[in-house]
Amino acid sequence: ADSSTGQLFVSQFAADAQGEVVNELGRYCPSEIIFNEGILDQTEVTAFIQKKLHCVADLCDNDRFDPQAAEDLIARHFSKPSGALGLDGRPLASRALGALLAYLYETQQKGLERITDIAYVNPEQSMALDLTARRNLELTQTMRTGEKRGTLLWVLDRTKTAMGKRLMRAWLDKPLVNPA
């Protein structure tokens, strides 16, 4: 979530999809993440967070991920149930969204009114590029210095606004499998 822009993306992966979670974290490079105790069993994910991500990681109580509390908070914030937001049949995504909203209400003084909708990101709609492929292709940062200059994004980005820049980066980070 980005409370400054109002963007909130939600996704759900299979329980054994540690590699996909790591790739998603690497794609977004969040400055802060929240998680529950269940993630501590996911050694690949925790190792990536500790060694590569360099962000604030906040361990939250499992109570914050309670399904009913999540549903109530989602309904209160968006004025509609999670099913109306496209989260029917996605219980893990609903619980994560509820925990995120609870965390944002607790820590953010303002800006939450900008979050008026969510976008469910279906992992099957975009090409799966792991961290190694993304690094070797130099999509958004060079292998040697980690700079933007010299990357595909640097070559293509002729956008005029910050929102356009974010959209261009999103297109490169998650190319569609079927653009039609």
Task: Identify the meaning behind each predicted range.
Residues 1-180:
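Charged catalytic and DNA/RNA-contacting regions of genome-maintenance
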